[in-house]
């Protein structure tokens, strides 16, 4: 049986490490990308069951990432996260562009893990 795969896309290494730790502890296989461009390239090579993506990153921000994903991969599941000032506006736009759920940094890990389980089940 293959493990469920999750792609983390965030330019902040500590956030990626935190998410990786929690997700791997829950039994998921995790891949990481440090920016949106790297993330979309990894997803094209090997689509994952879920993406957790920051919305404000260098090279290809999360909103542009969502646009590309929804154009190219209709069924990509994305949870959007953001910690920049005015993040609610960014997260509202992310929802409009196809993010299934959104979280402001700092987020509650138990809430995020519930969202991960929910999205993977639906």
State where each predicted segment sits.
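Short hydrophobic/Thr-rich beta-strand motif most characteristic of the beta2 strand and flanking loop
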Residues: 27-34, 42
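Receiver (REC) domain active-site loop signature in two-component systems and cognate sites
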Residues: 57
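Alpha4 helix (beta4-alpha4-beta5 surface) of REC/receiver domains from two-component response regulators
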Residues: 64, 85-103, 114
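C-terminal output helix
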Residues: 107-117
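Acidic catalytic/metal-coordinating carboxylates
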Residues: 35-38, 61-65
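Hydrophobic/aromatic residues positioned on beta-strands within the core alpha/beta folds
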Residues: 81-82
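Active-site residues of response regulator receiver
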Residues: 54
């Amino acid at each position: 049986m293959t493990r469920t795969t999750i792609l983390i896309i965030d330019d902040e290494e500590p956030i990626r490490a935190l998410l990786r730790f929690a997700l791997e502890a829950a039994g998921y296989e995790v891949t990481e990308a440090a920016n949106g461009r790297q993330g979309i390239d990894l997803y094209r090579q090997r689509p994952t069951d879920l993406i957790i993506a920051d919305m404000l990153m260098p090279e290809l921000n999360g909103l542009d990432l969502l646009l590309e994903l929804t154009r190219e991969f209709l069924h990509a599941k994305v949870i959007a996260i953001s910690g920049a000032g005015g993040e609610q506006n960014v997260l509202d736009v992310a929802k409009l562009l196809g993010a299934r759920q959104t979280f402001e940094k700092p987020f509650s890990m138990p809430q995020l893990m519930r969202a991960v389980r929910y999205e993977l089940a639906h």
